[in-house]
A protein has these predicted regions:
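Structural signature of the two symmetry-related core transmembrane helices
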Residues: 76-90, 173, 275-290
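Cytoplasmic helix-loop-helix junction between adjacent transmembrane helices
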Residues: 104-145
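Juxtamembrane intracellular "pre-TM" segments in multi-pass secondary transporters
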Residues: 1-7, 188-218
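Symmetry-related core transmembrane helices of the 12-TM Major Facilitator Superfamily/SLC fold
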Residues: 166-184
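Transmembrane alpha-helix termini and helix-breaking/packing motifs in multi-pass membrane transporters
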Residues: 33-38, 149-167
């Protein structure tokens, strides 16, 4: 991938994602352990918190994507979304209770819902047939790098300061500040002849192609029955009796996911996306079946590797 194919604004957005994912992934594998081991929450409470957080992001993405089309600007939503997520990060470190975790996770996912569609639209405005793969590949690479560095930073902090989860929540605010700084360097791109979108998101849905509606319906159904990754982390902790090993398993998953994305993308071009997607769902089922009956720590690595291939 040649650097000349990557516009400066895409590089800036890459650093925004790098630091944001670093902060988010410091906390993602730590939060369920903090909830259960420190605050004494049940698995049901963990699931409810994750459900509230994720459905918040899902409901907001379409609305703010449409709103950014209407106003013809992306950067304001990018600053607002990343800024809100940054402010949410340290809450459980300052107020170590379940309410603070709920507020933090919900605000963080609200920020994600605000920024995701406008950010992707801005990335798309810089892409064409010659560089779209390079642009989105670069951004995904920076995103994944942050997703690996974040949990490793959390592991280092747990090693140096055992069971001091509050410190990790506070420390995650630091990379978030860097991310917000880079958002102020993001500039909107004006495309000659481009018209602002009209109409509501509901009107877009009514006029959307039938195939799009069917696909979105299937994805929605799968999302409702899909389990959060936090339960795999908690199961790994129960089996290994180690916070650090459970988080390392999650890091391993991210590495496999990053390494497998491109080759499986090529396979989907060759054999068809339906076949690869169907195979992925089969692997997903095997992984959860395996975690239900996992007998030994060694199998954590095998199952997380398979889960990375599915993702």
């Amino acid at each position: 991938m040649k650097r000349k194919n990557i516009p400066r604004q895409v590089v800036v957005l890459g650093f925004v994602s790098l630091f944001t994912d670093m902060a988010s992934e410091m906390l993602y594998p730590v939060t369920p352990i903090f909830l259960t081991a420190v605050l004494g929450s049940s698995m049901a409470v963990v699931g409810i918190i994750e459900g509230i957080a994720e459905i918040t992001a899902a409901l907001l993405k379409g609305y703010f994507g449409n709103l950014s089309d209407k106003v013809g600007r992306r950067s304001i939503f990018i600053v607002l979304g990343y800024g809100l997520s940054a402010l949410a990060k340290p809450f459980p470190g300052i107020f170590p209770n379940i309410s603070a975790v709920v507020i933090s996770r919900t605000a963080d996912r609200t920020g994600k819902g605000i920024r995701t569609a406008p950010r992707d639209a801005l990335l798309g405005s810089y892409s064409d047939n010659n560089n779209s793969g390079a642009i989105f590949g670069f951004h995904r690479g920076m995103d994944t790098l942050g997703a690996v560095i974040g949990p490793l930073a959390a592991i280092l902090m747990l090693y140096l300061f055992p069971d001091n989860f509050q410190l990790i929540f506070l420390a995650a605010f630091v990379p978030s500040v860097f991310a917000v700084y880079f958002t102020f360097l993001v500039k909107d791109r004006k495309i000659p002849g481009q018209k602002r979108a009209k109409g509501s998101y509901a009107e877009f849905w009514r006029s959307a192609p039938k195939q799009f509606k069917i696909l979105l319906l299937l994805i929605t159904i799968f999302s409702f029955v899909n389990s959060s990754d936090v339960f795999l982390i908690l199961k790994s902790r129960d089996v290994s009796d180690s916070n650090i090993l459970a988080i390392l398993g999650y890091v391993f998953y991210n590495l496999i996911y990053a390494g497998a994305s491109y080759p499986f993308g090529k396979l989907s071009d060759k054999f068809g996306k339906n076949i690869i997607y169907g195979g992925g769902l089969l692997v997903f089922s095997l992984v959860y079946f395996g975690f239900a009956f996992i007998p030994h720590t060694f199998f954590i690595w095998i199952l997380f590797a398979l889960y990375g291939l599915y993702s």
